[in-house]
Structure formats: structure tokens, C-alpha cells
Amino acid sequence: MIGIICEKPSARRNFAKALGGDTGVYNGEKYVIVNLRGHLYKYDEPHKQVNKELENKYKQWTLDNLPWSYTDFKWKRVKVSDVVPLINSIKKELENCSEIVIATDYDAVSGEGFLLALELLEETGLINKKNLIISRMIFLDETPSTIQKAFKERTVLEDIYKNAECRKSLFRSRWDYTSQQFTRAAKAFTPAKLGTPRQGRLKSYIVSEVGQALDKYNNHIDKKFWQNRFIDDNENIYVSSKETKYDTKEEVPTDKYKQSTVTKESEQMKQSPPPRMYDMAKLTGVLASSGYSVAQIKNTYQKMYENSVLSYPRTSDSTITLEQFNELLPLVDKIAELVNVDKDLLSYRKPRATHIKDGGSHGANRPGVNVPKSIEQIESVYGKLGVRIYTVLAKSFLSILAPNYEYLQQKGFVTDYPDFKTTINIPKKAGWKAVLGNLNTDDEEETGKELGKIAEPIIFEGEYPKPKYPTILWLTKQMEKYNVGTGATRASTIGEMSNSKDKSSLLENNKGRLSLTYLGQYSYNLTKGTNIANVKLTEKVINTMGSIGTKDEINPLSVIKEIDNLLLEDIETMKKNREEMQIAYSERPQPEKHSVTDKKGNTVEFKKEWNGYKFTDEDIEALSNGETIIIGPFQGKKGQYFAKGKLDWQTYKKRKFYGFSLVEFLNSKD
């Protein structure tokens, strides 16, 4: 009997559909399918990992007990809550199997999916069963044909602990566990009333990135400048890098330049291919500006994936394989019609070298093989968010089937003053841009007019550019630039850090615009200049995982042991930062309030948050106008819900106050 371990119940259902049931015979082999439910085990608390004489050291959160010693740990695991019946059921199904197939998700970078199964096999003792064969199924989606093929082509693992996936997963999990020391160090410098600043490598880097961007944005002073430039008869501007920028218009010399002809230096037709396909981070960044939370996007996508409407969500790829391309090619016209894209625009129906590459795994986020019949069908099952997700990913995929964007690039200069130059791009053929429309987030600067004939000197009034305000889309691009996490990891980490229900959250998310919470600001100030907040540390962890199993392998244990010196350096840096911090963090601030006039004409104040939800500017305006609004989502035991309400006088413990008054709870915002 072959036992197949799936990652989650939905995967088990899809495997059963592909193979003919939860148990049965496929390809002449008897099988039984079981499913995990994410992690069933986790590493025990540090003080329970060591010998008795060391328990007190690892239990106390003091600087004197840092750094830890890696060799002290026994790496014991404990069951997570409410999984004992599931574990017992799985063990019962698998204990008589002669082969166990690890059919969890394939996470090429971290080996996370492999770890889920490894934990079960080790902790139940199944891994020690005599003559047991352990094999691996790798599948790129959960369609029947893919699962059937993966079952037939599964690979036997001769030594599970020499497997690269296994070794990556153990390295990452143990590095992250050991890095808890950075949180303990930060806690030692943090007032108890503030809570615990969680200083994991990703969270620390994100806080640092957002904090630095906010500093630049908030400290920027709007300032104008005046400069000599030229303008031609087609309104193209010519600039010299040698020209001084003056603080006032009166300072600009007006007798230096005269009218001149324009010389065309070069003219060339150019083209650009479609942008990279989407991952979860980019998708989240685009949709967050419409007010959707990271959790909403993640959960809706997962449901669509489980029904093969979309591809695997947690991919690390930005390209697709030739096989994946050919799988969707026959469905192109149906997908185009569904999202209202003119099929005549899709004239490049062959693999692009920039987007179709060998060596990927799940492939970039894209439509699945199950194409819905209509937009209305998508909305009825997955809501308006489902429509947005499908439309974005469908147009992203369809854009690679459109011709390149073509434009004429002209370079010119002012004949008598050749230091004054300009470059203009004139659109000629829209190509893929006609498919993407306003979804193109990396647009080139375009000009509608060619070079003119005559140029006149002008005093140009300009403004020094303001730094970008940090948004989810901006942050995910920064993380992508440094190869920090997969798209799904970026999205989920940002979502976790900006969860308004969590009092230890470090970020605030207002329709995709990010800011630091009070604790987040403290964390940012405390960890300036530390190793844990430096992107290079995360890069090293990722590069180490990537090297495992290759000829250029970096010793994983040596990377974990480096934490000791990094931590000692960070403790000194935090100590210095804490001494220099000017803001008193001993008290958590009270929620902000907003003034409004009630029905009787009295000026009253109401809190700008309710039940952990922070009202947006639009919410406050609507409430101030007496409107009823819907806020959320909130997370309950039975899932997400929303709250409908308005401003009104209320009484709590015999005290009257003015604030958001609940009308009713709703299952959706629509």
C-alpha cells in the first residue's frame, strides 16, 4: 500500500479526484491519501530544548543569557493545538504502508512543504519503519492530469536527510528559531508596557525599509528651483547638466542664450517586451490600494486555486515553463473574452524567451485551466475581489501574447548650445500596453510630439522631487530587488505585520499606504544600524538555502553559528540607540480622536478606531456627515466578518460617550 501525504484538505480532495478516491488503485498500485493541516508540530520552547542545568538560562529574557549555544539544543518538537485526532488518524492510515509519498507543496527556495511532512514522519516514528520507501511527488498544479503524471514519476529518496529539500527546510527552520535571540535582546531595551518588538530577519528589514522611507518623506522640504533651459516649437524641453539651479527666479542670468535651431542627433525605432508576470506580492500591492486587506486577497486566491481557476499561489517564479504555456494556449480566446480583451491584439501566440523558461516549478501567478463561464459566475462564487484578482492575472498572462510595445526614440540638442539635450519617446504601436491598460505599473515616459525645429531660451520653474511615500507595492518592489522572500512570503509577512487586531503589529496599512505603529516606530529607532535589520543578512540566509545541494554549497551550520557574533554586535548597537532615543516610550498613546458636531449642534469627539480597526480618512468624513458605513474585515472563530454602523451617543458602565455605534454584523462588505 502506498500512503500519500497531502498538505491540506483541499489538496487531498483534488488528489482523490485525480486518482479515483481517497483509497483505491491507480496505475496498478494501491494507495491511500491523507492530509496535513499546515504545521502539525513546532519546536518546543528554548528552555525545554536543553539539559536541566541550563533550563534557567534559556528561560530568562536577559542579556546576560545571550547568546545561546546551538549545540545545547535537542530540537524537540511539540504538537500544535487541536491536532492530536488528526495525527492519530494519519498514523493509523500510514503505519501499514510500504511506501509513503511526500506530496506536499514544492517550495524550491525554503523547502517549507517538505518540512511539514518531515515533522510528521519524525515525530510519529514512521520514518524509522524498517524497509519503508519514502518518495517525493512534485506537481506544479492540482489538475488531474498533473497529479496523475506526478504520481507515475515520483522519485524515491534513498536517504531523506541528504535530500536538498530536506536540508534546506531544516536549515531555515533552525536559523529562524535561533534568531529568536534578537527579539529577546530587543525586549531587554523595550518598556514592558509597549509589548515585545518581534525582530525576525524579514520583519526587522521591513520596519527598517519603511522607517527610512518615512523619514525621507516626512523630512523633505518642498523647494522650487529656477534654471535656464530651452523649449522647442513642439514644447519639448532641453536641459543642460552644467546649468546651475537657482533658489529664486531673479538670480537666473537672462542674457546668456538666444534662439537657435534644433539638431536631431539620432532617431531609432525601439521596442519593449511585456513586464514580468505577477507574484502574490505584486498582486497584493496593486489590489491593496482599493482597500482590500492582505488576508482577503490571500484567502480569496486560495479558494480560486483550489478550484483550478488560478495557478498555485505561493510560487517563487516570475516566468512559466513551456509546458505551462502550452497548457493555457488553447484557452486563450476564452480567457480573453471573459476579461474583455480584444482577441485580435493577441497576435504573438508563441513562447517568449523573456517569459517562458525552463527550470521553474509552479510558474508565475496566472489563470488556471478551469476557465469560468462569465464574470458574473466569478463574482457569485468569489465576490468582487475574485473578479479583480482574475482580471489582473488574466491580463498579465494575455499581455505576453501581444506584440512588443514599439516607439520612436529621438535624441536632439540645441544647435548653438549643444549641452542642452533632450530624449523623447513617441508611441507607434501599443502592443501589450493595449492589453494591460492601467495595470502597467512600470510605464515608460512617453511624449506625443517629435523634435521641433526652433528652440527658445526660457527660465524653467521646477521643484525638487519628493521622496516616495512607502506603499505595499513600493515595498514589495524593494524586497524583490534584494531577493527577500518569495512573492507569497512578502505578501503574508506584510499582512501579518499590519494586522490591526494584533496589539504587537508593527505596520499600519491604509489602502496600501504604510506607516509604523507606535511599537513599530520604537523598533525602527532601536534597531537602526543592526545586523538583523540589514537586508544583507536575509540575502545570506536565502543564498545559503539556494546553495544547498549544489557544488557551491555554503556550510549551513557555519551560517547558523555566525548568529552569536551578529547578536553581540546588535546588542551594543541597540544599547547605543536606546541611549540616544529622545522620545519617551514608557506610555502607550491613547487612540487619536476627531471632533464633530452632533445632532444637537454640540462639538464632540470620537475615537478614530473601533475594536482595533482604524478609520480611514474616507471613513471619518462619511461618519462626520452622518453616514452609515461598513468597516472591517475582523477575524472571528468562524472566519471574517464586517461591522455596519454610524456615530451616535452610547452608554458604557453608566458613562455616556459619542462614537461608532454598531448596527449589525455582516458576512461581506458587498
Residues of each region from the PLM?
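Phosphate-interacting basic helix/loop segments used at nucleotide- and nucleic-acid interfaces
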Residues: F73-L94, I100, V207-E209, V286, ...
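Structured, non-catalytic alpha/beta "coupling" segments that mediate domain-domain communication
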Residues: L19, T23-E53, S204-D247, L398-D443, ...
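Metal- or metallocofactor-binding catalytic centers and their adjacent structured scaffolds
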Residues: I160, A164, D247-R276
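Basic, low-complexity terminal or inter-domain segments flanking catalytic cores
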Residues: I2, D22, E123, Q199, ...
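C-terminal or mid-to-C-terminal helical accessory/interaction module adjacent to the motor/catalytic core
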Residues: N88, E142-D232, E267-Q271
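Intrinsically disordered, low-complexity regulatory segments
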Residues: M1-Q181, E463-K466, K477
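Structured, charged N-terminal subsegments at the starts of enzyme catalytic cores
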Residues: P273, Y278, K282-G291, N299
